[in-house]
Swiss-Prot record:
Active site, UniProt feature: D107, D337
Glycosylation, residue list: N41, N174, N261, N320
Classification lineage: Eukaryota, Viridiplantae, Streptophyta, Embryophyta, Tracheophyta
Enzyme class (EC, first level): hydrolase
Protein name listed in UniProt: Aspartyl protease 37
Disulphide linkage map: C117-C123, C376-C420
Species name: Oryza sativa subsp. japonica
Gene this protein is translated from: AP37
GO MF annotation terms: aspartic-type endopeptidase activity
Function: Anther-specific aspartic protease involved in tapetal programmed cell death (PCD). Directly regulated by the transcription factor EAT1/DTD in anthers during tapetum PCD and degeneration.
Amino acid sequence: MNAAVLLLLLALAALPASCAPPRSFRLELASVDASAADAANLTEHELLRRAIQRSRYRLAGIGMARGEAASARKAVVAETPIMPAGGEYLVKLGIGTPPYKFTAAIDTASDLIWTQCQPCTGCYHQVDPMFNPRVSSTYAALPCSSDTCDELDVHRCGHDDDESCQYTYTYSGNATTEGTLAVDKLVIGEDAFRGVAFGCSTSSTGGAPPPQASGVVGLGRGPLSLVSQLSVRRFAYCLPPPASRIPGKLVLGADADAARNATNRIAVPMRRDPRYPSYYYLNLDGLLIGDRAMSLPPTTTTTATATATAPAPAPTPSPNATAVAVGDANRYGMIIDIASTITFLEASLYDELVNDLEVEIRLPRGTGSSLGLDLCFILPDGVAFDRVYVPAVALAFDGRWLRLDKARLFAEDRESGMMCLMVGRAEAGSVSILGNFQQQNMQVLYNLRRGRVTFVQSPCGALR
């Protein structure tokens, strides 16, 4: 063999995993309650009730905050990620040499990858054994002077000889996780990636992930997220209904795609809001309920009116219907949150939606939902839930309409004899959240290079 060719092959073999040709990786998304110790005894009703309860707790953590930590060397004003208590879907990964296998909650609304580490002085209870960094031969704490450490909003220098990067990662609602920022080998299936930065947490307070999770894997748009560190340009997932015991799918890399010939496919541009730089943020233009256009409150600084001509799969509106497009995208934007089960609409939008649904459905309202939901209708005696009329609702994102049928809007509360809206009310002026109930049995593709999200209403089996 030619000596030059041999040297080239040796050089290519020595390249880190991040420099290798683009590949694809597939992970199973397990429902958090399917992994619970009492999973076998949980009914579909209880599975749904638990997911809704976690969503409400998670909502309480959305907001703006200034990260603060004792002896902080750097503190900047930025958005704080949503508190991790939602954690609806879990993935199995490995870290270190030899690989320590751990389970983590995935989160599209935060960036940091972290797991609890020994010795832990203030950790929440977890089912898996805790990672011991001293056992891993490839573990290395990052120095405080490193560029990676500078990516953290709040960090400080350790007091040991190497002045390791000590972080305080703050979620909204004053939930925090603290520890050492380090690098180690990350294992996804049969593939290993060297030098992946992650948080080795030794203290967590506030909203903790469920005990089935040893930490969190952030899939957000920031530099410390899994997709950013692996240079993944696209990823896709498909989620089963929240009360289902069937796992979902997550595909990272070039194979992540949505059916190109599907008639019920829409591609929506992702926007960047300076308040939420790590979130997958969509510009919410308006809503349609059946054939009726919903007028957004005239409380923004600028508005523009556009004819509501909706491509498939949106409901066909009246030719004269109009949807109000909001110029102030910061107020009426929506973030995609895989870890929240129900969708939350900004207060004024939610109130309008409720009023219009009451007019359309024409059933008596019920109270005291055992699921903990706000808007419920009493089902007529002898009439099955699947036979009750519910108008389709469409969300407008930059003029592209995402249709939500009854299965993605309402859930049956069998214990109360009602059907209840799987949409909640967020605070006035807050950002809206697109939850996973509205994304069920739908392929969701994130194309980070082109800056768009594609929704395809297709069974999860079609995502290979």
